[in-house]
Structure formats: C-alpha cells, structure tokens
A protein has these predicted regions:
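Acidic/His metal-coordination segments adjacent to aromatic residues that form catalytic metal sites
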Residues: 1, 53, 100-102
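Single conserved hydrophobic/aromatic residue that forms the stacking wall/gate
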Residues: 2-9, 13
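Non-catalytic C-terminal accessory modules of carbohydrate-active enzymes
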Residues: 26, 31, 39-49, 65-67, ...
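Extended catalytic-interface subdomain
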Residues: 14-25
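Glycoside hydrolase catalytic-domain groove-lining segments
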Residues: 35
Length: 223
C-alpha cells in the first residue's frame, strides 16, 4: 500500500505554492482561505498530536504551523494573495522571535540542507521565494534595519527599514531605488541589477496596501 503522512490543515497550504490563486478558489474564496489560515496560526494544538513525532517539537510550533517542517516555510507569505498581506508581516516576526534564539533550543527544527537558516536570512531581508520555479520573491517585512548583499557581478543590493522593531513590524510603504513600489514581489533581476529596497515601517497595519492584478505574485491559473 502507498502511505502518505499528513499534518492536517498545514498540508492544505503546503502543497500548492505554484498556484495560490487556484487554491483560494478551491477553498471557496478568499474569506474561507484567510479564515482557515488564521486558524492554522492561532489554534491550540494538543501535545498528544506531536509528542511522539520526531519531526515536530513544541519549540517549532506557532499554533498548528510547524516551522520546523521546512516544506511549510512559504505558508506565512500566503496572505500576500489576499486583501490582508499585513498578516504576513505580523506572523513572520512572531516566527523569527520564537524560532531563532541564541540558546540550547534556539533553532525550531533541524537545519535540513541549510533551509532553516536560508529562510531566516531571506525573511530578515523582507522577501522569500514562495514559488522557486519563478523569478519572484514575495514581499514580507524586514526583521533587521539594514542588510547589504554583495553580488557576484560587483553590484550591491541593500535593504533598509530604519524604524523596524517588534512594535513597528508593519509595512506602510515600499520604495525601490527611491521610487514608490506597489508590487507584492521583487524579481531576481531587481536584485542582480543592484540598488536599494526601502521599507517604511509602522506600528499599525496599512490595510490599504494590497496587491491586485499584475502587482500580485505569480499563480499558475491566473498568469
């Protein structure tokens, strides 16, 4: 017999990073999609469901979201396909605060192929490749006020978020090379061209900042 291991609600969001718009439709629309995603992060998961599972430890959980299970790493970014991308910004910082510490249990899972570390570095810069088969990095929110990438072509790519903090975790606006930027993603070429990605941070969600049309990240069924 074929055997498939499943982790319930988290697996629903794990399987389709290439077509989030299609998944939203299959789940009955944005309202239901967001509601179930909210539940994943906020639910109380009884210990009996993971205490004998070698891949899941309490330190790796945010609700029912298992950050220690690397194929789930794109899930906090899925709000970018909805009218509530600010929730990505909230949960990213929550995950980084809980899962990455300078302590004996400071990593919320084993670092398979360096993925736990790679997620942290990219998410600290404010973006992540939700669908690696494309050239897009979906925007979240930086964790650090300044990061600089030295590119192999001799150029540099900088990320600035001067006021970012646990309180100021929300993105008010974004600029790319000094110009207002409305897309929910940047591309590999944007990075390789060099330049500066600037995030204006605030303590309250900017609920008017949503991504529609071509500003929304890639989905197979809508591209």
């Amino acid at each position: 017999r074929d055997v498939e291991r499943s982790r319930g609600l988290g697996d629903v969001y794990k399987r389709q990073p290439h077509d989030v718009a299609g998944l939203i439709r299959l789940m009955g629309g944005e309202k239901k999609f967001v509601s179930r995603l909210d539940t994943l992060f906020s639910m109380a998961l009884p210990r009996k469901y993971y205490e004998k599972n070698e891949d899941i430890a309490e330190v790796s959980l945010v609700g029912g979201y298992v950050h220690g299970n690397e194929p789930s790493h794109h899930i906090p970014y899925l709000y970018a396909w909805t009218s509530q991308p600010w929730k990505t910004q909230y949960w990213l910082r929550t995950v980084m605060n809980r899962m990455y510490k300078n302590d004996i249990d400071g990593l919320g899972g084993n670092d398979d192929c360096g993925q736990m570390s790679a997620w942290y570095i990219l998410s600290s810069m404010g973006f992540y490749p939700v669908c690696p088969g494309t050239d897009q990095y979906v925007l979240g929110a930086p964790y650090l006020p300044y990061m600089k990438v030295m590119l192999e072509n001799g150029k540099t790519f900088e990320v600035k978020a001067d006021k970012v903090s646990d309180k100021n975790r929300y993105v008010k606006s974004v600029k790319l090379n000094g110009k207002p930027y409305t897309k929910g993603f940047i591309t590999q070429q944007d990075i390789m061209d060099g330049g500066t990605l600037t995030f204006e941070m605030t303590s309250s969600p900017n609920k008017k900042r949503v991504f529609n049309g071509t500003d929304r990240p890639y989905s197979l069924s809508s591209n």
